[in-house]
Regions:
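A short, N-terminal "cap"/entry segment at the start of jelly-roll beta-barrel domains
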Residues: 16-56, 138-139
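Ligand-binding loop in jelly-roll beta-barrel domains
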Residues: 44, 109-134
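Structural recognition of the beta-strand scaffold that forms the well-ordered cores
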Residues: 48, 72, 82, 106, ...
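Short acidic-glycine-tyrosine-enriched beta hairpin
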Residues: 54, 93-112
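Conserved short histidine dyad/triad with adjacent acidic residue
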Residues: 55-75, 108-110
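Glycine- and acidic-residue-biased ligand/ion/polar-headgroup-sensing regions
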Residues: 65-68, 75-93
Length: 139
């Protein structure tokens, strides 16, 4: 159920963002329009940064409360994560990887992932997909 909410949030942000042209895009965290979607966990919010009408790719900033877990899932396109605040743990079949603020993770398309905010404070991270971020639940 949480994954469905995440998918709804991502889709809603994508629709709200529209399709940028060839102009530069600048977003400052202190003035960004953070949005909380109905049904999302308390403290979960996001800001759509960019969508690509040709590829379906997108860039997104998200924040989740401490302890929040995103259940196992995979995407149809490659995903990049840069942790902006807090600590994110990436749980995979071959072990866990802790990504601290300033850290980076690359997840190839169709690789199963489970993410959790393992810091005592909220987690904030930048997400980028090079194609549509279609997400599918995994076991």
């Amino acid at each position: 159920m949480k994954l469905r909410h995440l998918l709804l949030v991502l889709t809603s942000f994508a629709i709200a963002a529209g399709q940028p042209g060839s102009k530069a895009i600048v977003v400052n965290l202190d003035t960004a329009q953070w949005t909380r979607e109905k049904g999302a966990a308390n403290g979960s919010e996001g800001v759509m940064l960019r969508t690509d009408s040709a590829t379906g790719g997108m860039d997104l900033l998200v924040r989740f409360p401490a302890g929040h877990v995103i259940p196992p899932h995979f995407h149809e396109s490659n995903e990049r994560i840069i942790v902006v605040e807090g600590q994110l743990t990436l749980h995979q079949d071959d072990g866990d990887a802790v990504v601290n603020a300033g850290g980076y993770a690359y997840l190839p398309a169709r690789e199963v992932q489970r993410l959790s905010c393992t810091s005592k404070t909220r987690c904030g991270f930048y997400l980028s997909w090079d194609g549509k971020p279609e997400s599918h639940p995994a076991k």
